[in-house]
Amino acid sequence: MSSAGLPAKPVFLITIDTEGDNLWAHPRTITTENAKYLGRFQRLCERYGFKPTYLTDYEMAVSAEYCAFAHDVLKRHAGEVGMHLHAWNSPPILPLTDDDYAYCTYLIEYPEAVMREKVRVLTALLED
C-alpha cells in the first residue's frame, strides 16, 4: 500500500455476467448451456493469476452445471460470485406488462416488498 492507502500496483477487476443463453433474444424458455464453457475461461484467468467475479442471475443460480463450477471456484479461492438480478424472470414473478420478457422490466419498477423478496431469493440461492 502507498502512503495514501492505495494499492502499490494497479488493480484489475474482471466481472462476467453469467446468465441464460441468448437472454436478450427474449426466449420464454431459458437454457444455460453456456455454463459448460466457463471452466475454459476460468483456466485462462488462473493461468494469468486473475480471480474473476461471476455476476450470477437466477437461471444460472439454479443450474446444476453452473453451481458445480461456482462451488469449485469458491472452494479454491480462484474467483468470486456476485448477484446479477434480472427482475422480469427472477422469483417471485409479478407481471408488470403484458410481456415482461419482451420489455425486460427493471428491479426498480417493482413494489418495494417485491424488490426485497427478489433480492432475498437470489441471495439465498447464491449463498447455498
Give the location of each predicted region.
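Catalytic alpha-helical scaffold of carbohydrate-active enzymes acting on polysaccharides/glycoconjugates
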Residues: 1-128
